[in-house]
């Protein structure tokens, strides 16, 4: 069976965890062995550092997210924004980045080398519902983004504006797709809800 690695934002955020889980389940239903790559974020601004301190205080919330994370099958590999282990590309057939704001140029913990899968071979690089989170890429980063994007085997994005950005930068048509959470049906989510204690109460 072919192996697929998901590269996404890993944080204490309901939407992030749910989209990660949904993409995993969809790929598994297609017959792939799926693993999500662990991420480590190094604080680069005081704002992010303080945010993390607050998150660490919220131990109950963190514990609940860890319980939900047991539903996500992680690899033993750890990525930083611009650092990755040598030979990572040999462990998987494909790498899929998305479906969060992994390409947001204003977030200094993403939109780095790992989020553009620079460690992988060109025929391994795929994005699913990736988001830029902006209407336009800052001028000073356009060349960088173009160099990264032109090497992808397939590009799909979450918003129409994202498709326009891709067309502007690399003259390619990016497919606008659904968020993976919308690919699971109602019964599948009800089963998740029954087994999960971290979801907010109604």
Please report, for each region that a protein language model flagged, where it lies by residue.
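A nucleotide-sugar donor-handling region in carbohydrate enzymes
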Residues: 82-89, 109, 129-201
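A polyampholytic, Gly/Pro-enriched intrinsically disordered region
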Residues: 54-61, 194-202
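Short hydrophobic beta-strand segments
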Residues: 3-7, 199-202
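Aromatic- and Gly/Pro-rich donor/ligand-binding loops
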Residues: 4-14, 18-147
